[in-house]
Swiss-Prot record:
InterPro entries: AAA+_ATPase, AAA_lid_4, DNA_helicase_Holl-junc_RuvB, P-loop_NTPase, RuvB-like_N, RuvB_C, WH-like_DNA-bd_sf, WH_DNA-bd_sf. ATP binds at I23, R24, G65, K68, T69, T70, E131, D132, F133, R174, Y184, R221. It is found in: Cytoplasm. Belongs to the RuvB family. Residues 258-348 are annotated as: Head domain (RuvB-H). DNA binds at R294, R313, R318. This is Holliday junction branch migration complex subunit RuvB. It comes from the Bacteria. It comes from Pseudomonas putida (strain ATCC 700007 / DSM 6899 / JCM 31910 / BCRC 17059 / LMG 24140 / F1). Its EC number is 3.6.4.-.
């Protein structure tokens, strides 16, 4: 799949997860960006600790790479408790969840990534655990089967998802705290890059950090990945120091332009402009034209381009906006005018 091969993919990689642990912030004071989330969580945590209670169950959602796992670990650290981590697809049977719940200490954090992928049978077991701190499990099979209740210590469930809309209402309603993570601005990302470089022992100028940040698509995970690749370039061709010029040359070599677009992004936009006159074009026709799967366009390529205002979905199909023409230095068609685009957005 194209996502796994992209330098600017927001999804994580196994080796990357290990490397990122060394540069993750451990406290809210070290946490950069997301000011509203940070202030709210500091308040909730302080209140819970003051009462000697576990924090309310917390749902964190937003695009991949924005720090949901990092925030879950910070919550545990600030509460002074341990965190046990798992993910929705791993919890295949009720027994898998029961094993984790029964190993929790009072006020511990249970972190479930991709919580929207929990199976219905596991989710049913989770309801009484969240609400009453009790575990209802079946022992035996057939006529000899019986239900037993196990008391659980008070704990905090922290669920993370990129697709909050896929959560069932009963599960969503059991979270007392719901936090949405937004894309980062260039200033905050630049601070993150500088902090990561300092931890890794890299010499970096402020302008070099900003150059990396502005091409990172508003995502800390991408910013840290680009930093590691720019580090390689700087060590071989830049005397070990990351300046604006070194960062610019490195990222151009890596085919990441000033808007954070790579070859796949540009190919999609140029195909729409050159082969379909800017659209409207159906997603199946577009997929055939660039030899990609439909879901790759919808789940991997489109979201950032739509969020940045380069593509619109209309009732008639996808269209590029005037920003796409300006990005490539092309003349803007008269039908787009000064205001920009077609009559209005829609969902195809």
């Amino acid at each position: 799949m194209i996502e796994a091969d992209r330098l600017i993919a927001a999804s994580g990689r196994d080796r990357e997860e290990v490397q990122d642990r060394a540069i993750r912030p451990l406290s809210l004071d070290e946490y950069i960006g997301q000011p509203v989330v940070r202030e709210q969580m500091a308040l909730f945590i302080q209140a819970a600790r003051g009462r000697g209670e576990s924090l309310d169950h917390t749902l964190i959602f937003g695009p991949p790479g924005l720090g949901k796992t990092t925030l879950a670990n910070i919550i545990a650290h600030e509460m002074g408790v341990s965190v046990k981590s798992t993910s929705g697809p791993i919890l295949e049977r009720p027994g898998d969840l029961a094993a984790m719940l029964t190993n929790l200490e009072p006020h511990d954090v249970l972190f479930i990534d991709e919580i929207h992928r929990l199976s219905p049978v596991v989710e049913e077991v989770l309801y009484p655990a969240m609400e009453d701190f009790q575990l209802d499990i079946m022992i035996g099979e057939g006529p000899a089967a019986r239900s037993i209740k196990l008391d659980l210590p008070p704990f905090t469930l922290v669920g993370a998802t990129t697709r909050a809309g896929m959560l069932t209402n009963p599960l969503r309603d059991r979270f007392g705290i719901v936090q949405r993570l937004e894309f980062y601005n260039d200033k905050d990302l630049s601070t993150i890059v500088s902090r990561s470089a300092n931890i890794l022992g890299l010499a970096i100028e402020d302008q070099g950090a900003y150059e990396i940040a502005r091409r990172a698509r508003g995502t800390p995970r991408i910013a840290n990945r680009l930093l590691r690749r720019v580090r390689d370039y700087a060590e071989v061709r830049g005397k070990g120091q990351i300046t604006k010029a070194v960062a610019d040359m490195a990222l151009n070599l890596l085919d990441v332009d000033e808007r954070g677009f790579d070859h796949s992004d540009r190919r999609l936009l140029l195909t729409m402009i050159e082969k379909f006159d800017g659209g409207p074009v159906g997603v199946d026709n577009l997929a055939a034209a660039i030899s990609e799967e439909r879901h790759t366009i919808e789940d991997v390529l489109e979201p950032y381009l739509i969020q940045q205002g380069y593509i619109m979905r209309t009732p008639r199909g996808r269209v590029v906006t005037r920003h796409a023409y300006l990005h490539f230095g092309l003349n803007i068609p008269g039908r787009l005018g000064e205001g920009g685009d077609f009559s209005g957005p829609g969902d195809e």
